[in-house]
Amino acid sequence: MILPMIVTQITHHDLDGYGASTVAAAFADVSRVVHVARYSDVGPVVEDELKRLRGAVAAETLLMTDLGLEEPTIAFLRRFAAMNRGRAEGAHHRLVVLDHHASSIDQLKRQNLEVAPDPERAGLLRADLSDPEVFVLIDEAHCATRMTHDQRALYAPEAKVPGETAAADLAALIESVEALDLWKKGEPAFAGGLALDEMFWDSVSTLVPASHPWHDRFISDLLMAAAGLLRAGATPAELERRSGELRARLVDGLLADETGDDPTLTARQRLARALARSDALFHRLSDGTLLSFGLDSGTFQRVSDQVMEAGRAKRVVNVQRAGTLSFRSIDGTALDGARAFRGGGHRDAAGGKLPQGSAHSREDAVAQVEPVLNPPPPDLSGSPFAALKNWKG
C-alpha cells in the first residue's frame, strides 16, 4: 500500500487565500496551512519550509496559492528544484504554485525564467524550472480559489469527492470569491462576494487565531456555510444578519466536548476559555513567560486573563507580525518585559517593539524575544580577569 503524500499549503491571508485553502481541504488531507499576511514575509516562510523538506525522507507536496512571485520567492523556486535533483529516485518532492498576478509574470521574466503557455492546461502559463515535479502556473483570468479547484489533480491525485451539497456550496464559494477578487462588479455574485469578504475580515482573527489547530477548520466551515446561504438566495443584508448565528453554531460544534464550557457566555468568551488551556497556542520561555503569536488585541486580552487566572503563567506576551509586543502580568513584571524592548506602559499591561522590527512566525518571534528577556550568562573563559580570579598563586 502506497501512502498519500503529506500536503502542506502556504497561502495568502485574504479571502482568496482562505478560499484556496478551503478548496484544497475539500479534496486533500492537508496536514498544515501557513497563512502569509504580507508578501514581504513569503521569502522567510518558504526558506523555513525548504529547510524542513531537505530533511524529510519521504516525498511531500508543497502547495502555494495566491502569494505573488517576488524575487525572494523565485530564488526559492530555483533552490527547490536544485534540492529535488539531489534526492533519491521516488523521493522527489512536488511543488505546486498557483498564482494569478500579472506582476508575477514580469518578475519571472526579469529573473530569466521562461514563461510559456502550458500545452497540457489551456489558458495557463507555466514557468520552466526543468523539473517535472515543479508546477508554477499562472492564470490572470481566474482567482486562486478557482485555480485550486481546477488544478486539484496536481496536489490530490486521489482526490476526495465532496457530497452533493458540499460540492454545490463549494461552487458558490468559488463564484463569489472570483467575482470579488477580480473586481467583476457587473456579475450577480459580486455583491455576495463583498458580503462574504466583510464577514471573513470580521471573523478571521477575532475568534480562533491562525496559530491554533482549530483555525482553518473554523474559517473554512464558516465560508462554506455562508456560501450555502448565498446559493439559497440570501441577500448581502441577510448574510450579515445571520453571520453571528453561523459563528455561534460553529463554536457550539468546536466546544461540544470541552469541559467547563458555559453556553450562556458570548462566542468569544467561550473560545477564550478553551484557547487559554491550549498547549498549541503558546511557547513557554525559559523564565516561564508564555508567548503567543499573531493574536488580535481583544483575543489576547481575554485569553491572557484566563491563562493567568488558571495559574499557567504569571506573565504572557503576544507578538504581532508587525513586531509589536504586548505584555500582560499579575506580578508587576509586564513593564519590566516591555522596557527590555524599548517600550513602556503599566506595571501589568505594557508594550514594546521587536529589535528586528517584525516576525514572520512564532518560531521567529521566540528567537528574537528569548535572548532579550533571558540573556545567556557572559562567557568569561577568554577574559584575563577570570584567569586572575581563579589563580591561587
Model features per residue range: what roles?
Residues T165-V303, E309-A310:
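Phosphate-rich cofactor/ligand-interacting catalytic cores and adjacent structured alpha/beta frameworks
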